[in-house]
Amino acid sequence: LVTTAGVTTNTNQLIRIGHGPNNATANLYLNGQLAPGIRVAMTTYSSARHHNETWVKDGYLLIDASPIDWAPLNNIMKYVTIRAGHFEINYGDAHFRRSDNGNSIRNALVGNYIMDAFTTEVGGEVYVRANGFLAMAGVTGGEVRGMITNPQKRSPSYLTKIGYDKQFSNDFRFRLTGSEYATASSVSNTLFSGDRAGSRYYDVLQNTSSTESAQAWSGAIQPGLSNSIHSVVVNPFVQFKGLEFFGNFERAKGRAAGETANRTWKQNVEEVVYRFAPDQRLFVAARYNTAAGQLTVGTPDVTVKRSQVGGGWFLTPNVLTKIEFVNQKYLDFPTTDIRNGGQFKGFMVEGVVAF
């Protein structure tokens, strides 16, 4: 119970929710070709759950050809790509398949992962690709915003990715990548809390004071490893004709400000999609997602389990409608936590237009 201005509120009383629509979300993409091999890109969230007003998500410069006609540099740039600016970092492969606010055409289901590894940071990445092999190394400021104050509390973040991706035939593709992200100290690192759009699961397991924007990440777990973090993820992808398998096997270790010991979180995701009909316009999908770890130092692990099944129909290549049934359970949460013994389930229907 919390008393404010003489009013007592039970912070563990669930807000009542029912059937109804979410607010519409929208993205605006601006892309420009400045010169051969030099591009600029900017993404704006025109409307989001967390921010209802228009604001910029990211913007960056990408170079994949030599701006100077010099043979040695031309040969190098056949294999190298450079990106610099304020961008969505390339940690893991799951961010290629998630819903990014209004852009949800790449997500076979409606919701994202329980632990959503997605953020934008200021820095640079260098890619090398050859014969199906790929490698990336990057360095960023480690936070959503570029900041120079409190330098004693801030250090760069380093990220790497290695992998292999090959289309062996028209029917078979295989991809396997491993990614690593690390920062020694930060005022507010957001690797698992950088989604500034918000969850699709409005107000689930929130109390009666919940608002659409303040509790924008309902249904998700943000482990709070905001001061230091070391995270690794392995992503296998196999496609045979219309059948796809994608996996996400992740381990993150770190702590929040004021904590003297590290906490560990683990997440596993298995997703299967089957696309069929002419031009693979119809699909069915299933995903099983678990996340487990410590909410605070010295406490037992808690676990969240989510099952999602659904499908969709591409009316055209850029118009999609999809449906999902989601069932999420919370295990071993403290008795004082509103999520103790919690569960939510139900249907979601979503329409997507990309143009």
Sequence positions of predicted segments:
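Outer membrane beta-barrel
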Residues: 1-5, 13-145, 151-185, 269-276, ...
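Short glycine/proline-rich turn/loop motifs
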Residues: 6-9, 217
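Outer-membrane beta-barrel pore domains
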Residues: 14-15, 60-63, 71, 172-183, ...
